[in-house]
């Protein structure tokens, strides 16, 4: 195990001491808990967090590209479904049924979407 001397602020020293004292109050023995061991544990934890952040930065994931691709797929799907609804509304099997008129279907879809969107993104009174 390597030995390292480092300087920390008084505030950090106090916080580490508070952790040690709390652990002792919880029943840890003096040989089980120490300032050095606690500081080492916190340093290791900090290094894990640092490594995780560096991995995230190096990740090939690009949020902007993902959003662009997702929006493109949504727009294509919306356009395709609109065409299919238009074709279906002209079918002789549903002609004369107001439930399957194109304008009625569009209004029904918009209403259902609005209800679902409000469920996840409630409107504020400020808007």
Curated annotation (Swiss-Prot):
<keyword id="KW-0238">DNA-binding</keyword>
<comment type="similarity">
    <text>Belongs to the relaxosome TraM family.</text>
</comment>
<dbReference type="GO" id="GO:0005737">
    <property type="term" value="C:cytoplasm"/>
</dbReference>
<dbReference type="InterPro" id="IPR042073">
    <property type="entry name" value="TraM_DNA-bd"/>
</dbReference>
<dbReference type="InterPro" id="IPR010992">
    <property type="entry name" value="IHF-like_DNA-bd_dom_sf"/>
</dbReference>
<keyword id="KW-0805">Transcription regulation</keyword>
<keyword id="KW-0963">Cytoplasm</keyword>
<protein>
    <recommendedName>
        <fullName>Relaxosome protein TraM</fullName>
    </recommendedName>
</protein>
<dbReference type="GO" id="GO:0003677">
    <property type="term" value="F:DNA binding"/>
</dbReference>
<comment type="subunit">
    <text>Homotetramer. 2 homotetramers cooperatively bind to DNA although they do not contact each other; cooperativity is achieved by DNA kinking and unwinding. Part of the relaxosome, a complex composed of plasmid encoded TraI, TraM, TraY and host-encoded IHF which binds to the F plasmid origin of transfer (oriT) in a site- and sequence-specific manner. Interacts with TraD. Also interacts with TraY.</text>
</comment>
<comment type="function">
    <text>Conjugative DNA transfer (CDT) is the unidirectional transfer of ssDNA plasmid from a donor to a recipient cell. It is the central mechanism by which antibiotic resistance and virulence factors are propagated in bacterial populations. Part of the relaxosome, which facilitates a site- and strand-specific cut in the origin of transfer by TraI, at the nic site. Probably autoregulates its own expression. Plasmid specificity is conferred by the TraD-TraM pair.</text>
</comment>
<keyword id="KW-0614">Plasmid</keyword>
<dbReference type="Pfam" id="PF05261">
    <property type="entry name" value="Tra_M"/>
</dbReference>
<keyword id="KW-0184">Conjugation</keyword>
<keyword id="KW-0804">Transcription</keyword>
<dbReference type="InterPro" id="IPR007925">
    <property type="entry name" value="TRelaxosome_TraM"/>
</dbReference>
